[in-house]
Amino acid sequence: METNLQQVKNSSQTFSEKQNPKQEASPSPISSTCSSPSHDFSFTISLQPLSSSSKHISPTLRSPSKTTSSYQQTDPFAVDLSPADEIFFHGHLLPLHLLSHLPVSPRTSTGSYNDGFTLPVKDILPDQPTNNNNNTENAITNISTEAKDDNTEDKAEGEIRVKTKPIKSFSLFGLSKWRKGFESNEREQEQQQQKIKKPMSLDLSHAVKKYIRMLFQKRGNGTQFWNRRQTSSYSFSSSLMGPNGNSKTMINGSYNKRDLIRGRRGELFSAPASMRTSPTNSGHLRVSTAGLSSSSGSTSSSSSDSTMEELQAAIQAAIAHCKNSSAVDRDDKVKDS
């Protein structure tokens, strides 16, 4: 069993060296796997009859000394062991029955990511030549330049899109949006005008209210003056001479009812000339201004009623006094004659 395992390893090495002579400059994954310790590999051998996958692999394993031409004339379904990355991954053998259906592609470079499984940069041995370092650096620089080119292309496309915006076609939806915007602008303007008009209207209303108050105050003062004039108290002083020579005076326009009735009949109201010429007893009416200087407390209803009655009585007494004085003058003229 051990001899069979060694034969498998030797055949894979010789086959890879013959088919890929260009990979000698750069360390291949197979060399790295071969240089790795043997405990990384695990093989399972079964004593069952050969399967389809083992049948395909058997010609390569039984005749390791054959040339590359003989390997090329083998069954097309056989697995090509030349690219070791397709068989070994991180030092472990992959199942061959899955790889038998995959198309085999010749490997041109070890740094490409599209050719199946590859070893990472960490697994490369330190004994590699300077050419490999140069190749990796060139690949990194190429990737960075490609990324920069992609960024510049994206920026240029974005600028072109911004510059060449498609002109919107005329549609009813556009009209509706335009109308809505126009109406909103009109509403804003109206609101601003209303805000400006409100303080003006408030000022006008305030001024009108002030003017009306002033008018009412003036009118109130006038009404108070007329009320005072109407409710002012009057004092009258007059003297009446009875038939017996008794004088009866009227103060504040008050006479007895009997005296007034007698005066109407002509029984009263006889006085000498000396008394007639005196200002106190001449019968002249004198209005006292006490009522004009009185306070507003005299404007009650009871005082107004009493003053009206006094005025009426005073007027009647004045009329009677005039009649009596004229009758007395006539009598004097008759006596003198």
Curated annotation (Swiss-Prot):
GO cellular-component term (any): plasma membrane
Modified residues (Phosphotyrosine): 211
Post-translational modification as stated in the protein's UniProt record: Phosphorylated on Tyr-211 in response to brassinosteroid perception, leading to its inactivation: once phosphorylated, displaced into the cytosol where it is inactive.
GO molecular function, one term: protein heterodimerization activity
Composition-biased stretches (Polar residues): 1-25
Subcellular location: Cell membrane; Cytoplasm
Keyword presence, DNA-binding: no
Comp. bias intervals (Low complexity): 26-38, 288-310
Effect of mutating residue 322 to A: No effect on phosphorylation and subcellular location
Subunit structure of this chain's protein: Interacts (via C-terminus) with BRI1 (via kinase domain).
Main function: Negative regulator of brassinosteroid signaling. When associated to the membrane, limits the interaction of BRI1 with BAK1 by binding to the kinase-inactive form of BRI1.
Name the UniProt record assigns to this protein: BRI1 kinase inhibitor 1
Underlying gene: BKI1
